[in-house]
């Protein structure tokens, strides 16, 4: 009997979250923090056997678990991971550890509830990446909204209620069509098994409707232009930990949905809609990058840069050649970009949080000369700013570079437009860094700053290691996903239109 590692990865953080919640009284804040940290670390350790035991040479689902759950509607508790999803599970658990540490001294009210929300959210997000049953996917996908809604709405900034409500409404409205699509697929195939849906022939009109239904749910989550407007508000109002999880993991749920649903279930519609998807992705990459350039609020700037970086991901998914094959290099680059963005965006939001905790302002104008008072912090901040701009040898470069290489094979002009983002990305990242960190000390707030403490340096150090290792040695990441990416590309290249009698 093999260990149910995936079930443990999902339910251990949720159970620790419930345990933390039971320590809800304020005199037990210290204990609640330690229980939450223990839960987050144990949850991360559970994901290590998944990586070590994963066989990258096959595209088959691994660590499979299947139990009857709701036999009346043929839904089962079915889990499994392949090369497309395996890395997101340790990434989620790793970011959760950092988030619990990030709120250690900063969050003073409702400490147990705050940490519990993140632990439960972590388990739910790991659930999204590891279920192979459509009904269960919908439940996990929607359930992630609730802890995030609470995190933004309770511990957020002055406009937190508006931001939380907008976030909830946007993402929920998008997902309603997905529920109809899932119900239709269950009705047509008689099962909720996602793998069976992948092989089920569908007429072109049906595929287009299904593609559109899934697009509404996933595009809002990514978020793609023009349904991205909830994201800057949510980021600006969210506490530091909330922004870290939102950017690092929650945006990936939508991109992952394209890989697991839109492309394999509706391949012919994916080809038909590819020009539209490429256009929307390029608008996100270029236009939203330019929007980031004029932001005065650091969190807004990084939020817009997140949308631009996720534009690279959707671009990499939808570049098909004449034979209908998606580009292997671009597809791998897009998935690497998802993982890298998890580290880099979490680091950027944490850096802004470190300064905000001291000065209580996110405005770029409130800073200047931070390097004089916080030299260690400024060094880490520089590394992450460079990674955000896509500097070679950082993780931010690998995915973007592969997508651009893939795009050159597909269409030179698309590659050229996509490559401009490296210039725009460097512009807004370095322009922000220059104004915040360099120059003379701007005011007495900056003069009184203290450098990052041990806890903050530990978080920055762990993220720096992740960004550099992935940037210099991406092979373990590409090796595990190779077989699964090729399998997906071959699957999407075959038409699923029913044969005419």
Enumerate the language-model features and the residues they cover:
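Alpha-helical transmembrane segments and their helix-start/interface "positive-inside/aromatic belt" motifs
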Residues: 29-41, 162-172, 374-378, 454-462
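Central hydrophobic cores of alpha-helical transmembrane segments in multi-pass inner-membrane proteins
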Residues: 8-23, 37-50, 91-103, 121-123, ...
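Short phosphate-coordinating micro-motif centered on Lys-Gly-acidic
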Residues: 142
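Cytoplasmic juxtamembrane regions at transmembrane-helix boundaries
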Residues: 101-117, 240, 248, 445-455
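Cytoplasmic/organellar membrane-interface segments at the starts of transmembrane helices
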Residues: 374-376, 430-501
């Amino acid at each position: 009997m093999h260990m149910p590692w995936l079930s443990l990865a999902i339910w251990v953080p949720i159970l620790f979250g419930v345990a933390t919640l039971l320590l809800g009284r304020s005199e037990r804040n210290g204990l609640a923090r330690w229980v939450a940290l223990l839960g987050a670390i144990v949850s991360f350790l559970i994901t290590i056997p998944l990586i070590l035991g994963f066989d990258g040479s096959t595209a088959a689902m691994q660590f499979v678990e299947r139990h009857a759950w709701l036999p009346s509607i043929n839904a089962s508790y079915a889990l499994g991971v392949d090369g497309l999803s395996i890395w997101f599970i340790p990434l989620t658990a790793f970011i959760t550890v950092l988030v619990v540490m990030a709120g250690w001294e900063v969050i003073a009210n409702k400490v147990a509830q705050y940490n519990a929300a993140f632990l439960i959210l972590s388990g739910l997000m790991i659930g999204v990446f590891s279920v192979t049953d459509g009904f269960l996917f919908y439940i996990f996908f929607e359930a992630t909204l609730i802890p995030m809604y609470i995190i933004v709405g309770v511990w957020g900034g002055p406009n937190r209620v508006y931001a939380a409500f907008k976030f909830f409404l946007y993402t929920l409205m998008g997902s309603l069509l997905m529920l109809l699509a899932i119900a239709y697929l269950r009705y047509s195939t008689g099962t909720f098994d996602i793998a069976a849906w992948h092989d089920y022939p569908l007429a072109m009109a049906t595929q287009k409707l299904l593609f559109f239904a899934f697009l509404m749910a996933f595009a809002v989550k990514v978020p793609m232009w023009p349904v991205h407007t909830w994201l800057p508000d949510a980021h600006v109002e969210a506490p530091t930990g909330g922004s870290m999880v939102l950017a690092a993991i929650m945006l990936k749920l939508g991109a992952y949905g394209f890989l697991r649903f839109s492309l394999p279930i509706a391949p012919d519609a994916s080809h038909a809609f590819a020009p539209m998807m490429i256009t929307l992705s390029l608008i996100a990459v270029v236009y939203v990058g330019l929007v980031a350039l004029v932001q005065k609020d650091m969190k807004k700037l990084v939020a817009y840069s997140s949308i631009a970086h996720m534009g690279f991901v959707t671009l990499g998914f939808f570049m098909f050649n004449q034979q209908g094959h998606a580009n292997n290099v671009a597809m791998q680059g897009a998935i690497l970009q998802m993982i890298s963005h998890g580290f880099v965006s979490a680091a950027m939001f944490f850096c802004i949080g470190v300064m905000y905790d001291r000065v209580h302002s996110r405005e770029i104008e409130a800073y200047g000369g931070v390097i004089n008072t916080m030299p260690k912090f400024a060094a880490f901040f520089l590394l992450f700013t460079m990674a955000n701009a896509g500097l070679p040898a950082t993780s931010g470069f690998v995915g973007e570079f592969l997508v651009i290489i893939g795009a050159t094979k597909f269409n030179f002009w698309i590659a050229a437009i996509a490559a401009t983002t490296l210039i725009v990305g460097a512009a807004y990242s370095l322009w922000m860094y220059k104004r915040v960190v360099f120059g003379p000390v701007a005011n007495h707030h900056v003069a009184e700053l203290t450098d990052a403490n041990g806890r903050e340096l530990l978080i920055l150090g762990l993220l720096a290691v992740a960004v550099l290792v992935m940037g210099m040695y991406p092979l373990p990441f590409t090796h595990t996903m190779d077989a699964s990416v090729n399998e997906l590309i071959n699957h999407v290249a075959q038409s699923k239109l029913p044969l005419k009698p």
